[in-house]
């Protein structure tokens, strides 16, 4: 795995840690697979929007993020716009954003 892939997965893993809620049976509500899947579950959509926001902050282009998340560019732009709306209306999203930002503070923007 190269440095870029390591950075991508560390951002995704940090967002999962910030957004995940452990279930009673020991499973997790959000996984890597659910982030890149087509799930419309609210928690997964919020986590996906947070991934897009954090990756834009890290310096990735919308096109790269769309490829990573297996989405169209338009859907990725919509997720980025949705993250602003979630931030404005959801306390849980604001808490997850602050936690993920703290975990990703050592991630410096990359310029390719």
Predicted regions, residues:
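General nucleic-acid-binding
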Residues: 1-20, 101-102, 106-112
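Short, Lys/Arg-enriched anionic-surface-contact patches
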Residues: 17-48, 74
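Residue-level detection of the helix-turn-helix DNA-binding "recognition helix"
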Residues: 57, 70, 81-85
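Short, solvent-exposed alpha-helical "recognition" segments
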Residues: 78-106
């Amino acid at each position: 795995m190269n440095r870029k892939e390591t950075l991508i997965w560390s951002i995704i893993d940090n967002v999962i840690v910030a957004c995940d809620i452990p279930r009673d049976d020991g499973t997790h509500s959000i996984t890597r697979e659910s982030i890149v899947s087509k799930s419309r579950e609210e928690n997964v959509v919020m986590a996906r929007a947070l991934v897009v926001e954090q990756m834009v902050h890290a310096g990735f282009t919308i096109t790269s993020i769309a490829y990573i998340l297996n989405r169209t560019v338009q859907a990725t732009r919509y997720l980025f716009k949705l993250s602003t709306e979630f931030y404005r209306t959801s306390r849980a999203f604001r808490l997850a954003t602050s936690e993920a930002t703290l975990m990703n503070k050592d991630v410096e923007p990359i310029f390719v």
